[in-house]
Amino acid sequence: MNQYLIVSFQAVVLFPIVVAVFTLPYIAYNYHKYGSILSLKVLIVYSFIFYLLCMYCLVILPLPSPEKAATLHSHKMQLEPFLFIKDIIKKAHVIPSEPKTWLTIVLNKAFLVNILNLFLAVPFGMYLRYYFKKSFSHTFILSLLLSLFFEITQLTGLYFIYSGSYRLFDVDDLIVNTLGGILGYAIVGPLMIILPSRDELDEVSYKRGMEISLFRRVVSFFFDMAFISIITILSRPLMHQFHILRAFEIVTLSYFSVLPILTKGSTLGNFITSTAIVSTKGGHPKFFAYFLRYFLFFGVYFYLPIYIRQALEKFILINTDASKDMGYATIELLVALLYFLFLLLTTIKAALHRSLFYERWSRTKIESTVQVQ
């Protein structure tokens, strides 16, 4: 039991790393297809990932020590089907006239190991039927393939990292794990009466995807800035006469001003999140509206505080009266506070799906392009 606790703890430690790798593609997929991220779907998907990770750790770990690994030179296989039944009977020590000995059937190691293998795959079948909407035949095949993946991994010594298998390839494990997946498929059937169906979850996602959430804006902007950074690096030889920050500014302004004209209102970030820039009067904005929109956006949110800061510093340098230092510091603090309140107000308005100042002045807005399937 202690070994299982250690392995489970290792899965908990690895989970954040797996989540970090998986999250960005998952967010991109959901926003592109549904236009939103539903918390219940996130819970289901991430619990499925955590389950698979625990399953992997339980089957693969612990790895052999270096001393043990040095002795591994063969690939062991047990190919007799249902041998586990013979093992259970052999270790049961049942005396028909003594009912208490019947418990040895379920309390011996051979039985417990196979029960663990059975229940290990039960959630897999449940997830496949409920969330992924797989049929019985698909669940059977996928459960078999999952078990086969683990057995081959063990047989090959983590795909020949080790010179031999450190665990036994057992055909009974294939049988029991596959039965576990089928059992999970059967168990979740009655529960689907009370659980929201996958179609219902998708319907809610599509409905929410018609609105432009603050997080959706942030995700779109994140992808855009990532692409801009890549373009800046790749185009650096063509703009070597400019400072790297100036080159970044040129690429940024060109990206947000020209690309939407060519794509009828979409940047790469918009495409990923299934959004587009449209005119507040309907249709496509005038060509200069894209430039105005992002000139105002970057000018107010990024450059204005820098210029204000520089102006205050120049003013303080000109007026070197030490007795007024506290007053200058107070002015700086008040300006910073006002700017913070402005950002806070803007964030609240975006969260409430209100039009922002640069959208009103450029007569543009962000609109969802999600197609309900």
Regions found by a protein language model. Give the residues of each.
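Bulky hydrophobic segments
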Residues: 1-165, 182-273, 279-373
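Individual transmembrane alpha-helices with interfacial aromatic-anchor signatures
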Residues: 168-179, 330
